[in-house]
Amino acid sequence: MAQQQMTSSQKALMLELKSLQEEPVEGFRITLVDESDLYNWEVAIFGPPNTLYEGGYFKAHIKFPIDYPYSPPTFRFLTKMWHPNIYENGDVCISILHPPVDDPQSGELPSERWNPTQNVRTILLSVISLLNEPNTFSPANVDASVMFRKWRDSKGKDKEYAEIIRKQVSATKAEAEKDGVKVPTTLAEYCIKTKVPSNDNSSDLLYDDLYDDDIDDEDEEEEDADCYDDDDSGNEES
């Protein structure tokens, strides 16, 4: 099959996809929704141990714009989520996914917003951090934000928020079983980087071709993500 000319955004996404498949982020699995479409990714997120989300299997969709990485992608949970920074339709509200415009009313610094040096790896790490440490100052779900603050400020004595999350976690187990996925429940299991094999060798061929297009200057220097670090603000209280 003849290969079509790849756009700069497709080249960037191909490089990122290969990097994430070879050096995955702990707690995530990345696949393409369609092998022929680099602009739509499916993400499986495993709930971090020692948090309310422990044992959960949450699916999400990342959609990239044509001008990526100059504009940010969107990140939408497909799994029903009750969280201060997740809208009812699953869209995640987080600074790193906001366009790089100067908006004093938002309360966000320009440095907190998207810029072309960000990538999927930093998005994934930001999302998993957000799950455990919600931003209650600018919530997407006001009711969830109020409920979370009550749970946090009461040190777990107000259990309404925790009970909703546990029910959602429990509901994801059937989906994990259907997908044949073993969800990690210990820190040791969670820290294992699961490589997702490509369905064929087409991505390798495309990846190799990138170096024939004089894009060696696009090499990214990415630090390996440290494994999940517990934080008291999101840990379960007994």
Curated annotation (Swiss-Prot):
The gene is UBE2R2. It comes from Homo sapiens (Human). Its EC number is 2.3.2.23. This is Ubiquitin-conjugating enzyme E2 R2. Interacts with multiple Cul1-RING E3 ubiquitin-protein ligase complexes, also known as SCF (SKP1-CUL1-F-box protein) complexes, including SCF(FBXW7) and SCF(BTRC). Interacts with multiple Cul2-RING (CRL2) E3 ubiquitin-protein ligase complexes, also known as ECS (Elongin BC-CUL2/5-SOCS-box protein) complexes, including CRL2(FEM1C) and ECS(VHL). When phosphorylated, interacts with beta-TrCP (BTRC). Keywords: ATP-binding, Nucleotide-binding, Phosphoprotein, Transferase, Ubl conjugation pathway. E2 ubiquitin-conjugating enzyme that accepts ubiquitin from an E1 ubiquitin-activating protein, and catalyzes its covalent attachment to other proteins by an E3 ubiquitin-protein ligase complex. In vitro catalyzes monoubiquitination and 'Lys-48'-linked polyubiquitination. Works in collaboration with various Cul1-RING and Cul2-RING E3 ligase complexes. May be involved in degradation of katenin. One of its GO terms (biological process) is protein polyubiquitination. Changing residue 97 to S: Loss of function. InterPro entries: Ub_conjugating_enzyme, UBQ-conjugat_E2_core, UBQ-conjugating_AS, UBQ-conjugating_enzyme/RWD. It catalyses: S-ubiquitinyl-[E1 ubiquitin-activating enzyme]-L-cysteine + [E2 ubiquitin-conjugating enzyme]-L-cysteine = [E1 ubiquitin-activating enzyme]-L-cysteine + S-ubiquitinyl-[E2 ubiquitin-conjugating enzyme]-L-cysteine. Changing residue 103 to A: Impairs polyubiquitin-chain formation. Decrease in substrate affinity and ubiquitin transfer rate for neddylated CRL2(FEM1C)-UBE2R2 complex. GO terms for cellular component: cytosol. Residues 194-238 are annotated as: Disordered. Signal peptide: none annotated. Changing residue 106 to A: Impairs polyubiquitin-chain formation. Decrease in substrate affinity. Residues 98-113 are annotated as: Important for ubiquitin transfer. Changing residue 102 to A: Decrease in substrate affinity and ubiquitin transfer rate for neddylated CRL2(FEM1C)-UBE2R2 complex. Residues 8-174 form the UBC core domain. Changing residue 106 to R: Decrease in substrate affinity and ubiquitin transfer rate for neddylated CRL2(FEM1C)-UBE2R2 complex. Changing residue 98 to A: Impairs polyubiquitin-chain formation. Pathway: Protein modification; protein ubiquitination.
